[in-house]
UniProtKB/Swiss-Prot annotation:
Cited SUPFAM superfamilies: Ribosomal protein L29 (L29p)
Entry keyword annotation includes Ribosomal protein: yes
UniProt keyword terms in alphabetical order: Ribonucleoprotein, Ribosomal protein
Protein name: Large ribosomal subunit protein uL29
UniProt-listed InterPro entries: Ribosomal_protein_uL29 (IPR050063), Ribosomal_uL29 (IPR001854), Ribosomal_uL29_CS (IPR018254), Ribosomal_uL29_sf (IPR036049)
Tagged with keyword Ribonucleoprotein: yes
Gene that produces this protein: rpmC
Taxonomy of the source species: Bacteria, Bacillati, Actinomycetota, Actinomycetes, Mycobacteriales
Length: 76
């Protein structure tokens, strides 16, 4: 996950899995920020990657709310 999670992979997840990924990413971002503040962070690039992953997850959730993308496994 050095380059983050591609949006097409996130679109294949259901709503519950997306929420789980979002929670995990937010926790990781919190820990990375804490490490940066204490001078223990060795990979500064990871901060940016995690922020972008969070934004991608929010984008996929919003696309589904607006009906721009379909929820996998949901038959119309």
């Amino acid at each position: 996950m050095a380059n983050g999670t591609p949006a097409h992979e996130l679109r294949e997840l259901n709503a519950e899995e997306l929420k789980t990924r979002l929670t995990e990413a937010k926790e990781e971002l919190f820990n990375l920020r804490f490490q940066a503040a204490t001078g223990q962070l060795t990979n500064n690039r990871r901060l940016r990657t995690v922020k972008r992953d969070i934004a991608r997850i929010y984008t996929v959730i919003r696309e589904r709310e607006l009906g721009l993308s379909e929820v996998p496994g949901a038959e119309a």
